[in-house]
């Protein structure tokens, strides 16, 4: 399996096993995000500012990267610090920041279910930008596999879970909100297209940057998360009055921050040693984890749409990574 296919060529079984374990952990952390957020709710809402959670997550990632360099887990490059190579990561941080904030604004122009279904278009935008920017061609089988991933995400978002006793499927916990009719405004559609493009561009650009630079991953992450902390600190400070930085935080909230920070570090390894396509499969597979945890922790029921989505994800993985 090649790097473009998401594998790591030339590795022995122990390192390949660690790579597989890393992908499984990342999948679990992605899937646990929405259920953990739901456990943070007080009186039906998140008791802390979302910008606080994002800022603390970026700060945690930055501290972990700095610690790994200080204790020598990853060697510092010889010679003076390559600060000039830090500048390109400012664009990565800006793209990720824009992407995270667009998610919030999109909710104003469409209902949660429409967002959950149509946001799967970012799989297609990532694949197109992956081919154009990194000059990798996808086979017909691989293209079909990504289409199946999009269909699986849309299927799950449309009704993979339901409240016990309710015969109508409901959106997953991440999209749970007060009932409202399906709708999307013209501006919402434009913003959604922009969101999908930025999502794909941020992923592909970061992958290209990390692979071209011959720097330790921890140092590259140090650059990226330094800009991320500065950007999110500015957004948090400019967000107006509201709860303090740590106000409303609980043990569950701390677990959300820690899991997202660790998952961000795992994803950076995927971007450097794997590919943006690998990341898409991790995110898609996390839907299964999300559904199972929602059923166990939040007492939601799995529907036929969940099992159909799981089947589509399995078929997509078989098509993309199977023998060709």
Swiss-Prot record:
The keyword Transport applies. It is found in: Golgi apparatus membrane. GO terms for biological process: transmembrane transport. InterPro entries: Nuc_sug_transpt. Found in a complex with SLC35A2 and SLC35A3. This is Probable UDP-sugar transporter protein SLC35A4. Keywords: Golgi apparatus, Membrane, Sugar transport, Transmembrane, Transmembrane helix, Transport. It catalyses: CDP-L-ribitol(in) + CDP(out) = CDP-L-ribitol(out) + CDP(in). Residues 40-52, 107-142, 202-214, 272-275 are lumenal. It comes from Homo sapiens. GO terms for cellular component: Golgi apparatus; Golgi membrane. Residues 1-18, 74-85, 164-180, 236-250, 299-324 are cytoplasmic. It comes from the Eukaryota.
């Amino acid at each position: 399996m090649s790097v473009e296919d998401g594998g790591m060529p030339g590795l022995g079984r122990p390192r390949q096993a660690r790579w597989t374990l890393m992908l499984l952990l990342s999948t679990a952390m992605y899937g646990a995000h929405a259920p953990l957020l739901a456990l943070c709710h007080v009186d039906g809402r998140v008791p802390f500012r979302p910008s606080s959670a994002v800022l603390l997550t970026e700060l945690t990632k930055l501290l972990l990267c700095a610690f790994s360099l200080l204790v020598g887990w990853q060697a510092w490059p010889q010679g003076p610090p390559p600060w000039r190579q830090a500048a390109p990561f400012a664009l990565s941080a800006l793209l990720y920041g824009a992407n995270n904030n667009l998610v919030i604004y999109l909710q104003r122009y469409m209902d949660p279910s429409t967002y959950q279904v149509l946001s799967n278009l970012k799989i297609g935008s990532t694949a197109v930008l992956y081919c154009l920017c990194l000059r990798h061609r996808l086979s017909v089988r691989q293209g079909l596999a990504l289409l199946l991933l999009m269909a699986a995400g849309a299927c799950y978002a449309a009704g993979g879970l339901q409240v016990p006793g309710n015969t109508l499927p409901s959106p997953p916990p991440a999209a749970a909100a007060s009932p409202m009719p399906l709708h999307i405004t013209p501006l919402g559609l434009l913003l959604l297209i922009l969101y999908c493009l930025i999502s794909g561009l941020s992923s592909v650009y970061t992958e290209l940057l990390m692979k071209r630079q011959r720097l330790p991953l921890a140092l590259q992450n140090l650059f990226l998360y330094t800009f991320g902390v500065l950007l999110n600190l500015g957004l948090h400070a400019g967000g107006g009055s509201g709860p303090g930085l740590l106000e409303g935080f609980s043990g569950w909230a701390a677990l959300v921050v820690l899991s997202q920070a660790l998952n961000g570090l795992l994803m950076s390894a995927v971007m450097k040693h794997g590919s943006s396509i690998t990341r898409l499969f991790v995110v898609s597979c996390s839907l299964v984890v999300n559904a199972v945890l929602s059923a166990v922790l939040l007492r939601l029921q799995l529907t036929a749409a969940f099992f159909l989505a799981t089947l589509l994800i399995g078929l997509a993985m078989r098509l993309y990574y199977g023998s060709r």
